[in-house]
């Protein structure tokens, strides 16, 4: 009987590895540009109860505009690499998980300006970083556990900070917000 009770204990800690891909929405100067957002991550989940848990982890995310950009010819599309640290509260209902929380993002590969037009005042920005090295967003997510170890889901990142880096030049700098929506496939270890 003691062996049966030992195996019946609920798991407090869960390890997850996941990949995600989807749509990047780069909102700048009042217009939207779209691109691709891709992510590889690890999450450590701590279960408080059968219904509630908190998950944190690390993910590498690439946001690239140039795959679908209308600025492909003669303009400057964006391409960034981030280290993301999510902190999500999660509610578990049968096979479904619903999560919400902040994501702290550190830009580890920043894109720089490349303006081709010689008559543009923005050519002074050439070679300078486009965005700030840190920002945070809000991440809602929904997951469906297809088995004990595999899950599918959808998550989004809603950028809450203006990430545009400004310089001391006599030109206007607009606001830039990064958002994405991704499909996620994960393995619970």
PLM region spans:
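Short glycine/proline- and aromatic-enriched beta-strand/turn motifs that initiate or cap beta-hairpins
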Residues: 8-47, 54, 186-188
């Amino acid at each position: 009987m003691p062996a049966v009770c030992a195996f019946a204990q609920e798991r407090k800690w869960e390890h997850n590895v996941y990949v995600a891909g989807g749509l990047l929405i780069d909102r700048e100067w009042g217009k939207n540009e779209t691109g691709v957002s891709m992510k590889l991550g690890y999450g450590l989940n701590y279960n408080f109860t059968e219904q509630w848990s908190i998950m944190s982890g690390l993910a590498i995310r690439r946001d690239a505009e140039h795959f679908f950009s209308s600025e492909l010819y003669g303009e400057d599309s964006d391409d960034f690499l981030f280290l993301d640290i999510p902190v999500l509260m999660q509610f578990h209902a049968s096979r479904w998980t619903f999560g919400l929380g902040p994501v702290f993002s550190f830009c580890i590969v920043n894109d720089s300006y490349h303006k081709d037009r010689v008559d543009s005042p923005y050519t002074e920005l050439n070679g300078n970083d486009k965005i700030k090295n840190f920002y945070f967003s809000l991440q809602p997510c929904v997951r469906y556990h297809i088995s004990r170890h595999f899950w599918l889901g959808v998550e989004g990142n809603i950028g809450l900070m203006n990430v545009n880096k400004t310089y001391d030049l006599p030109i206007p700098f607009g606001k830039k917000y990064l958002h994405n929506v991704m499909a996620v496939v994960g393995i619970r270890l």
